[in-house]
Amino acid sequence: MSAASGRFPGLFPIRYTVLVLCAVGTITGLGAALAWGGWWWLLPLVLGALSAVGVQDLRQTRHAVLRNYPVIGHMRFMLEFIRPEIRQYFIEGDHENLPFSRAQRSLVYQRSKGVSDSRPFGTLLDVSAPGYEWVNHSMVPTKLASQDFRTWIGGTPGQPLPGVDVCTQPYHASVFNISAMSFGALSANAVLALNLGARTGGFAHDTGEGSISKYHREHGGDLIWQIASGYFGCRNPDGTFSDEKFVENARDPQVKMIELKLSQGAKPGHGGMLLGAKVTPEIAAARGIPVGQDCISPPFHSAFSTPLELMHFIGRLRRLSGGKPVGIKLCIGHPWEWFAMVKAMLETDITPDFIVVDGAEGGTGAAPVEFTDHVGVPLQEGLILVHNTLVGVKLRDRIKIGAAAKVI
């Protein structure tokens, strides 16, 4: 063998060794099978199949690895395929890895199954490590009147909030709710399970921008109807907002609040598309779009274009819904754009009943990696900015703030 040339002298490149061995083994095995029969036929069959794979590897032009290393090159793709499982089961620690550590996942599994999640001895965390978080306790704890942690959104019954076009049907919301995930991105069974959980647990289920399907309605769990730039469930044939269709859904007793999505943490400013092949009759009926056609959510709204117009649109939605709470969901980008929205609240005296801050670490069905990894303000920084701004202009008491982005 020549090390300099990387070839067996006068024969073939070393990287073809496995293919050559398979071919030679096929011929040898065939002779053995003809001579002795029985199980010997397995040898030429297996090696012959591998030889055929190797020939196809040499002919294909899609993967350079397979073309240069026929047969054996498939090991690379097999190892890539099982790499996540190898890391999860044998390498990663209990408190590392993203988006959720093994300890966090185990806690969710235990509580979902009703298994005890208590632990003896003490914390396994390094309390001196950077990023360690804790909660300061009180030296004089009090007894809670209830463990059902809830808050009123849109005022309280009989005591509406100050301002113009205010809410007249406040909602007593749980402090934990199901974040927005659309039917279409989720299966029917997933939507059914989430809404049944919402009804059983006494919290709200955000529909996501895909509007309200029959599966959202089947179990009767409270709904937060999310409306995005595609206006699904409340759109005209040309994709613009429809007052009449909005009223049909918004005044459904199961719909407790309306959430106007301005941007999404995982892909702020990007919009989205559901391929026509996925637009089934059920999805089309829920969204009010043609079956089998690409379903596009523009990156911007057509019903408003300025902060002042946004506030008037919020007031319009509140009137059309019969006075239900109307809020906005956004991922903070340029701070001055958020400040402009707050200025519009002060000028119009119209405020959203709630603001959901979506962190840049939030999830989605599909988004470009650049948007997912590097666009938008993370949750903690966004929450601080929104809270401090509203406190500074004395609007914090009128607006409830929610958070979304891998909250566990």
List each language-model region with its residue ranges.
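Conserved, well-structured core domains of diverse proteins
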Residues: 2-206, 210-220, 225-237, 241-266, ...
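N-terminal small/glycine-rich loop or linker at the start of catalytic domains
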Residues: 169-177, 264-268, 273-275, 285-298, ...
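Internal alpha/beta core interface subdomains
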Residues: 188, 192, 201, 205, ...
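Short, glycine/charged-enriched secondary-structure capping and boundary segments
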Residues: 193, 239, 273-275, 341-344, ...
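Glycine-rich tight-turn/loop motif centered on a GG-T
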Residues: 225, 229-233, 276-305, 365-381
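Short amphipathic alpha-helices and their capping/turn segments at secondary-structure boundaries
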Residues: 243-258, 271, 338-351
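Non-cysteine beta-strand/loop elements that form the S-adenosyl-L-methionine
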Residues: 257-263, 281-291, 352-360
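Glycine-rich phosphate/ribose-binding loops and adjacent secondary-structure elements
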Residues: 298-408
